[in-house]
């Protein structure tokens, strides 16, 4: 397993997470190819992080899968914009950290799954119980 961390990217974490969810569990080569054609700004950064994680582990891109792609909130740059009548409004410029983990893909041999037969049991019908005062008075008399 190898990791890559890219810090303080000027990109909203919520926008980057939409892209990060798409590539989790994919082959690294397929993930980078699909990110190449995405129009989003975050796709370029996530593709760079995946290629960096592959290089950090010394793997080939076609032999690893993206185990996890996590986007965390980083520092928020705060700016002020002048508004009417001498007031000012705050502009938030969010940044994010991207962490990608890749794992070498293992070739799994096909395993035959045995299906267990379900045993059905029939339940006895429930007894009628009356617990009201009137019903118990009728039974006693």
Swiss-Prot record:
Record text on subunit structure and interactions: Part of the 50S ribosomal subunit.
Chain positions covered by the region annotation Disordered: 110-141
One term under GO cellular component: cytosolic large ribosomal subunit
Record's keyword terms, sorted: Ribonucleoprotein, Ribosomal protein, RNA-binding, rRNA-binding
Superkingdom: Bacteria
Gene name in the database record: rplV
Protein name: Large ribosomal subunit protein uL22
Family assignment from sequence similarity: Belongs to the universal ribosomal protein uL22 family.
Record bears the keyword RNA-binding: yes
Organism: Campylobacter jejuni subsp. doylei (strain ATCC BAA-1458 / RM4099 / 269.97)
The protein's role, per its UniProt record: This protein binds specifically to 23S rRNA; its binding is stimulated by other ribosomal proteins, e.g. L4, L17, and L20. It is important during the early stages of 50S assembly. It makes multiple contacts with different domains of the 23S rRNA in the assembled 50S subunit and ribosome.
